[in-house]
Amino acid sequence: MRTDKKNARNTKKKIVSTAWKLFYRQGYDNTTVDDIVYESGTSKGSFYHYFSGKDALLSTLSYLFDEKYEELTDALTPEMSCMDKLLFLNRELFRLIEDTIAIDLLAQLLSSQLVTRSEKHLLDHNRTYYKLLRTIIQEGQQSGELTSAASVSDIVKAYALFERALMYDWCLCDGEYSLSQYSANMLPMFLAGYRA
């Protein structure tokens, strides 16, 4: 049973990561379900088991982000301060966005999250993203690096809001500046407000 779940998760993961690579390389409109199935080495049956169509993949960007966070978790060391961990995660994710996500698709995801009546994936607190933030911020408060005047939940919410605001502005400005560079300059000032 466990192997079946792992295989299913791997199949879905292959479809999602392949789709986003193709969206970036060929453009969303020029990528077909057949392209995704072929490049991912899966089947149409598997594709339609997980997704109702190509449009359903737009809501998987947060899944792709969480996949990156899981990968980056191994690079976090106990010697790193909580601030260093947050700066590292932010830099790496924003580089991923700049290098592999088309601005129009990111903008589409952000705008769809504003109008959807269904699940708002970016706000799902069961995501790896939120779990990782909670862990880092709790560690920062326990070590005395971060203030305890604000709750872990409040700091997590403010941090996530900060990142979404930067992504939104970057899309609004049509990527005229480096998202990762701008964040590297602004995030330390934002986080300074939470130092103990």
Label every model-predicted segment.
Residues F94-R134, E145:
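Short secondary-structure transition hinges
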Residues R2, F88-R95, K131, T135-S143, ...:
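C-terminal peripheral helix-coil segments that are non-catalytic and often amphipathic
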Residues G41-F51:
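Short hydrophobic/aromatic patch on the recognition helix
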Residues M1-Q26, N30-T42, A56:
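Basic, helix-initiating cap at the start of DNA-binding domains
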Residues D84, H121-N126, Q142-A158, Y177-Q181:
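All-alpha amphipathic helical-bundle segments outside canonical DNA-binding/catalytic cores
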Residues T60, D74-T100, V152-Y159, S180:
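Hydrophobic alpha-helical connector segments
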Residues F51, L58-F65:
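Alpha-helical DNA-contacting segments of helix-turn-helix folds
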